[in-house]
A protein has these predicted regions:
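N-terminal signal peptide c-region/cleavage motif recognized by signal peptidases
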Residues: 10-12
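Sec-dependent N-terminal signal peptides
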Residues: 1-3
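Exported/periplasmic ABC-transporter solute-binding proteins
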Residues: 18-134
Length: 134
């Protein structure tokens, strides 16, 4: 069945996308896919309440990271890496904080105010909520 959807070009619509999670301190608002991409590309650095955004990611070769970038942001991991490297080497910005595991992602987002990250599915935790974007 998936091969039929893939051949029709519909597979990404039905693919399981990673869940974007935020610390409960992040102000609730509706964000666009462009805003979301800018946050993870480290181009949008401040939440609407004026607090700095803390971005957490997984390694480029992590399957959850690949799924997140492709299905949630409609990009490829190497495109993000290139943008982060360009900002880092030019001194105009920094790369997000890279974590080693999904469990570490959950812990960091849960304990870091204004944090954003992604996981394969939302954990049941009052200090974490899903990020609302269209």
């Amino acid at each position: 069945m998936a091969s039929i959807y893939y051949c029709l070009g519909l597979y990404p619509i039905f693919a399981d996308a990673a869940e974007i999670i935020v610390n409960a301190s992040v102000p609730p608002a509706r964000y666009s896919r462009t805003d979301t991409r800018a946050i993870f590309a480290m181009q949008l650095r401040i939440w609407p309440n004026g607090e700095p955004i803390k971005v957490f990611t997984l390694a480029d070769d992590n399957p959850i990271h690949k799924d997140f970038v492709k299905n949630n942001l409609n990009m490829f991991p190497h495109q993000f890496r290139r943008a982060w490297d360009r900002m880092t080497y030019s001194g105009t910005g920094i790369a997000p904080i890279q974590l080693d595991s999904e469990q570490e992602m959950i812990e960091k987002v849960m304990t870091t105010p204004n944090a954003i990250g992604y996981v394969s599915r939302k954990p049941e935790n009052a200090k974490i909520r899903l990020f609302d974007y269209q």
